[in-house]
A protein has these predicted regions:
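Structural preference for solvent-exposed beta-strand-turn elements
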Residues: 1-127
């Protein structure tokens, strides 16, 4: 999975879905946000098993949101939100390497996170 997106677009989506994440959840994978990138769309999903919030960002032009490779992964919600919020740059690159390693970078900064396989995320039945 690899894409480049305007910071404000990604941050807006992360803020929306992160409202469903509980810090007291007994299921560790639910502390994450599921990123699904396919068919020119990025879908973010977060849930605490009671409330689920999902939002979709469409790639209408390559200037605001450019998709290079499709894929899906779960990224810890608190970490990704804090990183994106603090980045000073206008564009953010997100790349998954070696299946579960997430590389988030801009012109001036770079971060490495460990992801969780999307197969571990519970099926919440939204479509």
């Amino acid at each position: 999975m690899k894409f480049t997106i305007k910071k404000e677009i990604l941050l807006d989506a992360l803020v929306k879905v992160s409202k469903a994440i509980s810090t007291k959840n007994l299921i560790p994978v639910l502390a994450g946000i599921k990123f699904e990138l396919k068919k020119k769309k990025l879908t973010l999903t977060a849930s605490d098993n009671d409330i689920t919030i999902q939002t979709t960002i469409e790639s209408l032009n390559d200037e605001d949101f450019k998709i290079e490779n499709e894929g899906s992964i779960i990224i810890q919600g608190k970490y990704i939100l804090d990183i994106v919020r603090k980045l000073p740059d206008e564009y953010i690159n997100v790349e998954v390497v070696d299946e579960l390693k997430i590389f988030i970078y801009t012109d001036k900064s770079e971060f490495n996170l460990n992801g969780i396989s999307e197969s571990e995320y519970p099926n919440i039945g939204l479509e």
